[in-house]
Amino acid sequence: MQYSIETVLDIGNEEFYRAARYQIPLSVLLINSRDKNIFDVLEELLRPTDIIQQITHELIVVFLTHTNIENANTFVNNIKEHVNFSATVDEYKGFKVEFIENLFTDNQQTMKVS
């Protein structure tokens, strides 16, 4: 899990900085999916300012810039119309290491329930 946390921190470092500095919303999704079409769907729905990165074979992180938690949940529901997956969503509020650790912990608990 530590490797994944560090990877997400590296990928989103600039976005975490912008969100904190300019007080703009930033939501992060951890998506678990075996569906091979997930990237096609994400690329169709994401904006040019959003960031997508595959962390492991089944785990994808998505940074939704200028997006609060409500809009992030709407985005997740739009994806669910096209592919099967589980996801953890949260809005970044300021402490990046703790934020990512909590996101991964919540994601692992979601996987145990699914």
Which residue stretches match the model-derived regions?
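Regulatory and interdomain segments flanking nucleotide-handling catalytic cores
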Residues: M1-S114
